[in-house]
């Protein structure tokens, strides 16, 4: 509605630091980015388990839980935490989120979400800014021109100020998990939109490195599940002269199918659990721009590469930096001196 749109705009006017979270993935289950936190494991076929952390416990405490009660626990902690951030990854469609798979269900109804218990339990929104990150769910970001869609429910009834999600079925996971990895690895430094954008640029750079022509190949979603593989191989071979690897197919599949709803200018960040291990200095010297990375005793090279978050979907990520001023497109890397990178360009 127009009211929902204005609320989204109003709540993204000021910077916001994520402090509380509710997570249904094994990733980030240590809760180190949050002051108060709870998670449920919704992807296991075995016994369920959950954990929580607060100002008193400091570290996440883990507990076993019958998987049939995971949704009950999620609803309980949702109401208790009123979380700034929600992260999910289990099976979903435009109209429901299974939590866990085939057992519990969140469903959408006219702009609201409800837990599908014996008696429906509708969930209330929040009075503060909120991010919903559907890192690995199929289809949940697809509004599908339907007021009963999950995306409308998250943005309206659950009052998400920003939402990230897939608009198609997902099997490769590079785009959704990659965005989360960039955001978490750069906690306190990158906003949500910056992380999503940099992950996209990383994917495009990787594709260009394989074959520049890959960037002209669009995944044939309209071919249908039974024909899309053969159709993609045909399109890929026509463009590159080669058959695709699984990774190349996955990159093209994922390239343009994750949506960020919300104001991309919103300054919303994760809280860094420790002092940032480096700072970046930028100077212009004539036609040279000098970027210097200065590390300190808190520096963690593994964290800069992504901290192994969802490594099976997203390998190590590179260091990324937003220049404070616009550079011309013909920037050339000149040389590295110690911890400095020297680029030659004319500043606009």
Stretch-by-stretch model annotation:
Residues 1-348:
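Cysteine-dependent hydrolase recognition
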